[in-house]
A protein has these predicted regions:
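Membrane-lumen/periplasm interface segments of multi-pass, membrane-embedded glycan/lipid transferases
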Residues: 359-446, 554
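Transmembrane-helix signature of polytopic, membrane-embedded enzymes
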Residues: 13-17, 71, 223-226, 245-265
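Transmembrane-helix motifs of polytopic, lipid-linked glycan transferases
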Residues: 60, 230-254
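Membrane-interface alpha helices of multi-pass inner-membrane proteins
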Residues: 269-271, 300-316, 320-327, 350
Length: 557
């Protein structure tokens, strides 16, 4: 008769878990050593002990969360921060989109410079860091050509796009991100002096403050440019975690959907970077969480308005759409001081005020910059593109639809990391399945008999998501895409994370009416965090693997 694990003493169960983790670590290391030829680069003992120790630490972290974190929001916040730490270190320096510019601006702010001076340069340590880790590292190290296969003697075309690790010749050394670390760490013994690095074309301050605090603390502790990068990432992650924790605490419905999006590898990849998307995404998730509250008091309205104003500092104009959801709260549900139109007007006025103030500040305190060319060159012209769109609406719709189709509607690119140059197929394939699982668990039987949120809230949020997605595409088409081009330049999956979250409640309602899941709300919430945390850990491991372990592209010259 089989032994039921639940009937075993807790100490025995955890002891078995420790043994299983160690065994899995050994098997995992063996897979890396065999499939990626890791024995030629690293000692087998180091790999085996490292993999086993990592899984034991993850198991210990899981035990601590289960034992000490009380409540759904607390458990979710701790998991978000711990999983985010893995992404902060698995992701190599400056490999988040635009992180090189974000690093330079954050570094300047951390040294007390709140203006923008193109003649101001950075320490040599920073210049060495940017030299060793160029943005879009995989693209920067991509090669293509025709070589001869030594086994068959036939000519064979090669293209290393999408591979961070390359091996030139069957017995050649594997080249990859580790070489960049070695290059940077050896800068003290190099004779050459790096080219000076000046301030970037980036004129924001407030969105970079969390990262600047982290950099300042790292500098106080004696760290150099690389340590400042990780310090900034960690404090940025802390800001993302706090916003997510507040969102989970305020959400009254569909909390599995929120936890799943927050723990999605793409969310953690951005949250644990120097990008202002860390706080931007956190504010999006917070505003959507507040829409699940049945009644709004003054505090709820104030938090929503503050988040709405902040997102307009980071991404102006398009984010004015987030003023409108205030009207999704019915009059009978509104208990804040002041009427809804006044709050909406205040949010709109505040958002416009900070937008104009940010633009003025970025111009008034800008020094020694030459004429800033449009991104994309002279072929990009917003006025001409807008006129082209108005003259050719059907062609524009075709361009938008074609862009979505070419990019798997961006829901199939949840595993596209780096500067869109490092695809991880497993995460691309499973990302939509995780969102579907979140919708299924969010469709669980509700505790209360009344059906809430109402169709007005759920449908309104879904409509907002679609309008926001169309607006994001239109903005990129008008401001970043050459006039008349048949596809949109610059769109990325991270822009649509808040869209998927806004659509998940509507999908959950549909699933609840069709398949009627028997799982209760309590069980759904108990299951979602461990499942998504494990998925996030696996995503961080895959990110590390693709940059440092394999696959390795063998180039035959």
């Amino acid at each position: 008769m089989p032994i039921k694990l639940q009937k075993l003493p807790a100490a025995v169960r955890w002891g078995l878990a420790v043994l299983c983790a160690a065994a899995c670590g050994v098997l995992w290391a063996y897979y890396w050593r065999v499939f990626f030829g890791l024995d030629n680069r690293v000692s087998p003992l180091v790999v085996t002990l490292g993999c086993a120790a990592f899984l034991e630490v993850c198991l210990l972290a899981g035990y601590c969360v289960r034992r000490f974190a009380k409540g759904f929001a607390a458990k979710g916040a701790v998991c978000i921060f711990l999983c985010g730490l893995l992404f902060a270190f698995a992701n190599p320096p400056l490999q988040t989109p635009d992180e090189a510019d974000h690093y330079l601006r954050t570094y300047a702010i951390s040294t007390g410079h709140f203006d923008f001076d193109a003649s101001r340069t950075y320490p040599d340590d920073v210049a060495y860091l940017l030299e060793a880790f160029p943005g879009a590292w995989v693209n920067a190290h991509t090669s293509a050509g025709v070589g001869t296969d030594p086994d068959t003697g036939a000519e064979k075309a090669y293209n290393t796009a999408g591979y961070a690790l390359k091996q030139y010749g069957k017995d050649g050394a594997v080249q990859g991100m580790a070489d960049s670390f070695a290059l940077y760490l050896a800068h003290d013994v190099r004779d050459s002096v790096p080219d000076p690095v000046s301030e970037p074309v980036s004129f924001l301050v407030i969105p970079f403050l969390p990262g600047a605090v982290g950099m300042a603390l790292a500098r106080l502790l004696g760290f150099g440019a690389l340590g400042c990068l990780y310090g900034g990432r960690i404090v940025n992650l802390l800001a993302y975690t706090l916003l997510c924790a507040l969102a989970l605490a305020k959400a009254e419905r569909y909390r599995p959907a929120f936890a799943a999006i927050m723990l999605l590898p793409m969310s953690l990849f951005m949250g644990a970077s120097l990008s202002y998307d860390a706080t931007l995404l956190g504010c999006y998730y917070l505003m959507l969480a507040l829409l699940t509250r049945k009644e709004w008091n003054t505090q709820t309205a104030g938090i929503y308005t503050a988040a709405c104003i902040f997102v307009n500092i980071a991404k102006p104009y398009l984010n004015l759409l987030w003023v409108l959801p205030i009207f999704l709260v019915a009059k009978r549900e509104w208990h804040a001081k002041g009427r809804r139109p006044l709050w909406a007007l205040g949010g709109f006025g505040g958002a416009m005020a900070v937008t104009l103030l940010t633009e003025w500040y970025g111009t008034a305190f800008r020094y020694n910059y030459p004429i800033i060319e449009r991104q994309g060159g002279s072929t990009v012209n917003g006025g001409e593109q807008l006129a082209f769109v108005l003259r050719n609406p059907l062609r524009t719709i075709a361009a938008f639809w074609g862009t979505l189709g070419e990019n798997d509607f961006f829901i199939g690119q949840l595993g596209l990391f780096g500067w869109k140059d490092l695809p991880i197929s497993f995460l691309n394939l499973t990302g939509p399945l995780v969102l579907l699982l979140a919708a299924l668990l969010a469709a669980a039987q509700q505790k209360r008999a009344d059906a809430f949120p109402t169709r007005r809230r759920v449908g309104g949020a879904a409509l907002l998501a679609l309008v926001y997605a169309a607006g994001a595409m239109a903005a990129m088409y008008i401001t970043y895409t050459p006039v008349g081009m048949v596809r949109i330049v610059g769109l990325q999956a991270r822009y649509f994370l808040c869209v998927w979250l806004a659509l998940l409640p509507a999908l959950a309602v549909l699933l609840r009416k069709t398949i009627r899941p028997a799982i209760t709300e309590e069980k759904a919430e108990a299951a979602i965090i461990p499942l998504c945390a494990c998925y996030a850990v696996f995503g961080a491991v895959l990110l590390f693997q693709h940059y440092f372990v394999g696959p390795v592209y063998v180039v035959y010259a």
